[in-house]
Amino acid sequence: MNQPPPLTFNYERDTLLAQTIALCALITNHEPNVVERSKSILANVGNYPALAYLEKRFSKGSSTFLTELRIELLKELNSVEIDGKETPLTEFQYDVWRTLPSAAATAVSAPTSAGKSFIVIEYLCNRATIEKTFTSVFIAPTRALLSEVQHRIEKRLEGVADVRVSTVPAPDVQARNRQIYVLTQERLHVLLSAAKLSVDLVVVDEAQGLADGSRGMILQDCLERLRNENPKLQAILLAPGANGFIRVGEQLGMPGIVVKETELSPVLQNRVQVTVKQGIAKQFHLSLLTLTGTREIGVVTTTRGVADPSTRLAVAALELAKSGAALVYATGPADAERVSAQFVADRPIATSDSLPQISNFIKQHIHPDYGLAAMVRHGVAFHYGNMPKLLREALEDAFRRGDIRYLVCTTTLFQGVNLPAQSVFINTPTRGKGTPLEAAHLWNFAGRAGRLGQELAGNVFLVDYEDWATKPMNESSKFDIVPSFSETISDHFDAVLEAIAGKMPKRSPRTPEHARIRAAAGLLLARASTKSTSRVLNRLSTLVEFLNFRMHSLLFRHVASLSTG
């Protein structure tokens, strides 16, 4: 008689399944016994943000005394003191929190909604509070993210005297003993070139940027210079989901880097395929993407036409996100303006007090006829990187408050800006004029669906997904971090040597390859000036093997030329 296969336990898979069962039960059934059992499951898996939401929504009387006692005990075991209050953490957050004090280098890979930046910013602020002298750098990839991080740190450190928090790459004229710089890698590069800086803690947000061409090399250069200045530097690298941190640690001189990773999100995220059947007017057919395939959910009959592909994205958002905030992906600034304009005709003037103020600001300081001024009054806006800082921040704040209901955005929001929404809408896996997007970028954006502590689930609506050239949302995808410097040396070795010899690629026409070659050559020349070139190259095991191969190839060619001569 055949024995059944032994049961295997996979913590992440089984925890996700248990959490999904509990959250789905709560969404569909509010009976007291369902609420009690779901709360018990969520406590078992350490999903305390969802429990906090339930405590606001359901009275404690919906559970028995023993259940409530057990939940409180579990919360107590996972609680730490943050800003003077006992705060329960998820299992993953608690694990990271315990690891940070003793690790010289830590990499944290987790979904957008897992709360990794919360833990790291709290750790940074805790050190700034208790240490007499402390210098930290928080590296963020975009200017849009700098303001948000600066605000979070300043808010956390309210009441703590003599701590400077700055996004300006200049030394403190007051020479305070505790300083926190919040900078892009370019700004940090300027600071390191102008002043000698000994840093105790560096945090790299969106660390997958190490693979981002010449910008990745600037980031690597900054990290190496910080470590050279202070060998005891503590480094924390954050990414929304990434592989390759061990390799990154070796190449950055952090061979003992501790990697903490999870794919669990405290919020249930549904990927919903939105399809229009040919010949059937005013209907969206919805199906759920799961690990085992696609399951039909049902049909939504619309009040608007759905036949035109150019307006279908906006129509889908209007019909399927009638409550809650929605992020809508656009391929570029022009596309963002075009799509956002499609919302206005079907949206009434909003009653918010802040939106007329934003509208007037746009008219007075940008242009009286700028289309965004009229849009915001309807609770609609577009968002991209090349916008005035004050305007961009005002739009983000209005979206967080719920005054702006539909925000049409470009890839600017893919990196770090904390703008979760109840729903996310995507209708293409490309950017610009059809350039394919890396699947991990789309998953990072989709991870903004579901506001932690405000709802149990978020929805990612994939419009016309059946027609996409690729299917990147079928299964989870991570960034594969290969530092741009080592990749450029391997792929363009001869060109880098020529650049070092003085034959730099021309600045025009500008290509990504030329920029990478110039940056790699510049990094090596900078290291040569400090006699540290060998230290950098010795970390690149793949490069050493490549150089051996190149040497043997050149010898073979030399011998061959002698024999034929």
Region locations from a protein language model:
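N-terminal helicase ATP-binding lobe
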Residues: M1-G565
